[in-house]
Every structure is written in C-alpha cells, then in structure tokens.
Amino acid sequence: MCIRDRAGGVIEAAVEAMRAKVPDCKLKAWLGPRIGFDDFEVGSEVAEVFRTKYPDVAGGIKAKDAKYCVDLAAYAKAALNKVGVEDIEDCGLSTFADAERFYSYRRDGEQTGRHAAVIWIEQ
C-alpha cells in the first residue's frame, strides 16, 4: 500500500466495505512490517497531507534535517479508530531497519522482493 493510499483513506474504505457485507462483524487489525518512524522521510507536502487528514494524531510527524519523518503506525491506528476498530495489534517491525528479514525499496532501490499478508474470517 503506498503512502498516498494510506493518507487517502484506503484503510477506512476497506473497513467500510467489510462492514457493508457483514454489518455486525467484530474487526481486529494487525499492523505488519513497514518502514519505521525514524526512517520514513518525506517532504513537507506529504507531511501536511497527514496533518490535515488526521489532526488529532499527536507526535506522528517530526522534523529531521530538511525533511519530516512520519509514523505510519500512528496514522494507521488513527484511521482504524476513525471507523470504530479499536482492537489493533502492531508488530512494530521496520522493513527499512531489518535488512535480514525484509526488502525495502527505500533502502535497497531496485533490488526488491515481495511481502505477503493473510486475512481471514472466523465464524
């Protein structure tokens, strides 16, 4: 999922689509590996998108040199909370910082691989 998708509301839209199909569903979210807060550097325009979309997130952006670092986990949690998902677990792993286990386009450039996710329904 790209950063503009996350800021653009794809998390909220996905939850709303699930609830449209199963209105009484109890959702649990798991935040998987992603680029860590200290390593996700963006320009002011991207930082401002997050500030505007989620003004209640405290500490989700910090200045670093001439750039800004964005805490993707904090904003994903805010997006989930916005649509009523409160049961959220976060693995806390950074794809950028953990080169032994994860690919990172930002770290490795063109030498990339793939990540996978599992989603299921329990009845």
Predicted regions and their residues:
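Active-site microenvironment for binding and transforming phosphate-containing groups
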Residues: 3-123
